[in-house]
Amino acid sequence: MSERILVNCALPYANGPLHLGHIAGAYLAADIFVRFNRLNGNEVLFVSGSDEYGTPITITAEKNKTSPQNVADIYHREHEQTFKNLDIVFDIFTRTTDPEHVKDVDEFFINLLNKNYLEKRYMVSPYCKSTGKFMPDRYIHGTCPYCGFNDARGDQCDECGRTLDPIELINPRCTSSNEEPLFIATEHFFLRLDLLSDELLNYLNTRENWKPNVINFTRSIINEGLRPRPITRDIDWGVPIPLNGFEGKRIYVWFEALIGYITGARVYSKNIKDDDYWKKFWLDKNVKSYYFIGKDNIPFHTIIWPAMLIAHGDYNLPYNVPANEYLRFEGAQFSKSRGIGYTVNEALSLVNKNYLRYYMASIMPETGDSSFSLNELVSRVNSELIDKYGNFIYRVLGFISNRKINIKKCEPDSIINEFKRFFDEYSESIKNIKIKNGLQIWLEAVTLANNYFNSEAPWNINDHERLNQVLFTSLKISMYLTAMLYPYVPSASSEILSSLGFKTVNYKFDDMLGFDDFRPLKGEPPFKKLEIADKKINIDLMVGTVKYVNDHPNADNLYVLGVHADRDITIVSNIKKYLTPENLQGRRILLIRNVKPATIRGIKSEAIIIAVQHGERIIIPEVNADDGSRMKIDGFDFNGDIISMDEIKRYKFIVDKNELVLEYNNSRFIITENGKPLKINAPDGSSIVL
């Protein structure tokens, strides 16, 4: 019996390009889940959109000297296209600046106000003396009072996931001026979460299908005691409060953006000219609603949004909130604001969407953080998708086509029952949103398929009926494998289905698995070996210990340093006016080791020292690694070439959040030491001098 399913996907901020962390956190899993359910005959509404009123949009607008609306317009269009580039297809990708959204927010606000779930209170808000303005929560950074993370935002700590108020931060600072904000009392509306605690706990007790990390994190916060939470702010960019006397205030983004899920469903209904269609998904208690989000969005979707829905009274509560953990880039967290890691479109310039979707699904951070590696992507795509699955399909189709064999329907070999079992296990995994496990089951089925074809060796069969049965069975197996792959890699799977003779437009599992009218076409191999020419950064960062420091005999402003790295080397450096020999002697320092040796005033120099300049200060970062150790640059390997100073100028090093970052090819990459970001005690924005 078919089901009606609502799938809502976190609304990304319209302030910059989408990166792979976004895709792994929410969007790819949601798209796979939606495609799977539609193949099963379920009716699905798939909703997302741009979150356009958040503080990140105003920050981006200020940096680019433009309006928040212009920023939102640009990135809304870019996000729409990016999702299409990756075959992620929503029924509706809405906008929170849409007037329809403002109507929904107004209705929600008044509903909760009339039911006494909103109340006016005074609260202290951060005020920046330099700008003369009240500052949004995200403009305040400091130390998290719960976990001690020293770069928590005023609305949330990215490290432990706690929602915060700016006044809770230890040593708070305005991001614009780095000065301590004033906290001034102003009147605002508060959501009475404290009145909803018991109902929230009762609701949570019915959520047996949630991931343990999601349910435990949520329950622990509620058990600590929920407090009234402000839903308005002294800001200019946001949905106006629908009451007189509050013209200078706006409804805060964490409250209004959640209502965008309802707006998206309503706007979609208008688009298909069925104004009540959305009600089938929001008012019917039999509908299952899923919210695909990243780890940082858990409290908003498991506490605040259910509380808002309970208070409102008309709408379905979330059936499941399958939040994923973080995708990391060589140990560091992907970050849109900091430009760390690949954006989606940068990755798609290196690999096609089929390969990227496959690899991202295979490393999806469902129960713990996972790490993206370009080298691993190449390896897994080539060894699994191409060598195992693609090669099986090509061998079957090629054998039939080359021998011009006309396949007749017959009873397949009993091994087909194993593939039915694989399919059942695969289906159970995806129904329970174990996307990575579903792909692993598929890979086990691919292995069995190759074993069957090799062991039956059709090229050695002389009996025509037996040959037909083996090839018919192989084609049936091909349908099972391709049907199971389709939610993960839809474009390539569609082409392979066509080459098997399956021409149906609206795919359903029943049709694919029951198909037996095979008219196979050989065509080209379904996949080509993946090679990424530009997968190496040609720079060798190595650790060395300073053994001695001498004055240069022919230049008053230069030092001659003896350094032990992979071997004993000599370096000529111009840091003499900044640092004494005592500052350098015995220090473990970071070098660019593969620079072409140069003779400087009569002495050969074999490397370049990495130094940090901030104002008039020069800092030599010290590292805790053995001499000769190489630092890792996110996902890239040193290719062993010697480079000139002109080539080195293609690379730019900066300090960001006390981490050494390499800028290259319009991307930013974290330098890591033993799998962790290399920490440098220098202010953000410090430049690297060589």
UniProtKB/Swiss-Prot annotation:
UniProt domain tRNA-binding: residue ranges: 535-632
Cofactor: Zn(2+)
Keywords on record: Aminoacyl-tRNA synthetase, ATP-binding, Cytoplasm, Ligase, Metal-binding, Nucleotide-binding, Protein biosynthesis, RNA-binding, tRNA-binding, Zinc
Residues given in the record as ATP binding sites: 336
Motif residue range(s): 'KMSKS' region: 333-337
GO cellular component, one term: cytosol
Motif ('HIGH' region): 12-22
Top-rank taxon: Archaea
E.C. code: 6.1.1.10
Chief localisation class: cytoplasm
Binding partners and assembly: Homodimer.
Listed name of the protein: Methionine--tRNA ligase
Organism: Picrophilus torridus (strain ATCC 700027 / DSM 9790 / JCM 10055 / NBRC 100828 / KAW 2/3)
